[in-house]
Curated annotation (Swiss-Prot):
Listed EC numbers: 5.4.2.11
Site feature (Transition state stabilizer) residues: 181
Catalysed transformations (reactions): (2R)-2-phosphoglycerate = (2R)-3-phosphoglycerate
Gene field: gpmA
Keywords: Gluconeogenesis, Glycolysis, Isomerase
PANTHER family: PHOSPHOGLYCERATE MUTASE (PTHR11931)
Complex formation: Homodimer.
Active site residues of this protein: 8 (tele-phosphohistidine intermediate), 86 (proton donor/acceptor)
Protein residues bound to substrate: 7-14, 20-21, 59, 86-89, 97, 113-114, 182-183
Functional summary from the UniProt entry: Catalyzes the interconversion of 2-phosphoglycerate and 3-phosphoglycerate.
GO biological process: gluconeogenesis; glycolytic process
Species for this entry: Neisseria gonorrhoeae (strain NCCP11945)
Name of protein: 2,3-bisphosphoglycerate-dependent phosphoglycerate mutase
Classification of source organism: Bacteria, Pseudomonadati, Pseudomonadota, Betaproteobacteria, Neisseriales
Length: 227
């Protein structure tokens, strides 16, 4: 069995080196090109999908659409879920990473970005950009909508969707594409690869590059590689 992850193509805020999180930004021109190249590469290598899963953020949805279009599979059903959203970076969202490091120190920013269980400064619920004010999340209980997350909390958010939707799809024989975000994919990778809390800090997933997992019947990883 195979599973394909793809992190969205470069976003406009990736290009500007800003913390993004749940803020909804578009793909950059480079990001659009990365998504198109990924779709063509998947087609060239014979990858076909029966179902695709993505987040409710534009950059991931757009990447999913482009990948499927460029691989002549735009008909493939897509399921969008907030559970595959990027990690919520709290009050860091919209800030320049370099300037934030100059203010708080490189080590503190590294911990905020990469540690497994350290939360960023939380966003106020009445902030203009709070997810509590976004109709995408209006159906969710208020205590479920995050104001900031670490990777541990992100995994706790993503894991129920893996267990309820993605894993059963794979086990039923469906060929699955997951188009999501750096940290939601890192969280899933931690789970399926059994990566330790310490080692996950070093895992980077590049934008717009298909990551293929070969899995056994128990969804244990046999092999993984980038196309």
């Amino acid at each position: 069995m195979e599973l394909v992850f793809i992190r969205h193509g470069q976003s406009e805020w990736n290009a500007k080196n800003l913390f993004t999180g749940w803020r909804d930004v578009k793909l950059s021109e480079q990001g659009l090109a990365e998504a198109a190249a990924a779709g063509k590469k998947l087609k060239e290598n014979g990858y076909e999908f029966d179902i695709a899963f993505t987040s409710v953020l534009t950059r991931a949805i757009k990447t999913c659409n482009i990948v499927l279009e460029e691989s002549d599979q735009l008909f493939v059903p897509q399921i969008k879920t907030w559970r595959l959203n990027e990690r919520h970076y709290g009050r860091l969202q919209g800030l320049d990473k370099k300037q934030t490091a100059e203010k708080y120190g490189d080590e503190q920013v590294r911990i905020w970005r990469r540690s497994y269980d350290t939360l960023p400064p939380l966003l106020d619920k009445d902030d203009a950009f709070s997810a509590h004010k976004d109709r995408r999340y209006a159906h969710l209980p208020a205590d479920v909508v995050p104001d900031g997350e670490n990777l541990k909390v992100t995994l706790e958010r993503v894991l129920p969707f893996w267990e309820d939707q993605i894993a059963p799809a794979i086990l039923s024989g469906k060929r699955v594409l997951v188009a999501a975000h750096g940290n939601s994919l890192r969280a899933l990778a931690k789970h399926i690869e059994g990566i330790s809390d310490e080692d996950i800090m070093g895992l980077e997933i590049p934008t717009g590059q298909p990551l293929v997992y070969k899995l056994d019947d128990n969804l244990k990883v046999i092999e993984k590689f980038y196309l």
